[in-house]
Structures are given as structure tokens and as C-alpha cells.
Amino acid sequence: MFAIIKTGGKQYKVSEGDIIKVEKIEAEAGDKIEFDQVLMVAGDDVKVGSPVVEGAKVSAEVLDQKKDKKIVIFKFKAKKNYRKKKGHRQPYTLVKIEKIDA
């Protein structure tokens, strides 16, 4: 059985036991969270929502809060000695999917 959930403006295909990396969620490690924006559930039969499946939810546990690898933004203008270097590390949350209720 798998489900497609929406969180942080992105969609993820999940099944029980999966560990996924999602946009930052305000929760501590060990907290239980629920995703109620379930777009599709598939098992023996397929339920597709419009836009979400009514009464469906996915239960998960927060494993960790981390930051992604650094990306470097470098701006310059040719022949003008204009240089700017900036870095960014996007925060994310590691989540373990525990149960899919359809």
C-alpha cells in the first residue's frame, strides 16, 4: 500500500516504513505528526482525491532536523570588479512513515 501526500509545496510517494526528507516542519525529534493532505491512496483498490482523499491521513514520526548541503550563489559583472559570494543551507526534516489510514 502506498499514498501520495503533499507537504511543503511538494508531493511525495510514501509507503509504511519509508524515511523521507521534507521541507522543515516545526516539530522536535521524536514527535508524532500527521499528514492530512493525502492526494491518492493505492492498495487493493485505488482512491484518487479531488483534490484530497476524504478521511485519509498518514501518520509519521520526526527523526531529525538538519540542514542540507551548502549551495553557493556567486554574482559578478564582467570587467567591473563586482563580485558577491553568498551561501545558503536549506533546513529540512527527516520523517519516518508509520501508518497509512485510508
From Swiss-Prot:
One GO MF term: structural constituent of ribosome
GO cellular component, one term: ribosome
Entry keyword annotation includes RNA-binding: yes
Keyword Membrane attached: no
GO BP: any one term: translation
Keywords: Ribonucleoprotein, Ribosomal protein, RNA-binding, rRNA-binding
Coiled coil: none
Pfam families assigned to the protein according to its UniProt record, in alphabetical order: Ribosomal_L21p
InterPro entries cross-referenced by the UniProt entry: bL21-like, bL21-like_sf, Ribosomal_bL21, Ribosomal_bL21_CS
Family note: Belongs to the bacterial ribosomal protein bL21 family.
Biological function: This protein binds to 23S rRNA in the presence of protein L20.
Description of how the protein assembles with itself and partners: Part of the 50S ribosomal subunit. Contacts protein L20.
UniProt-recorded name of the protein: Large ribosomal subunit protein bL21
Organism this protein belongs to: Finegoldia magna (strain ATCC 29328 / DSM 20472 / WAL 2508)
Protein's gene: rplU
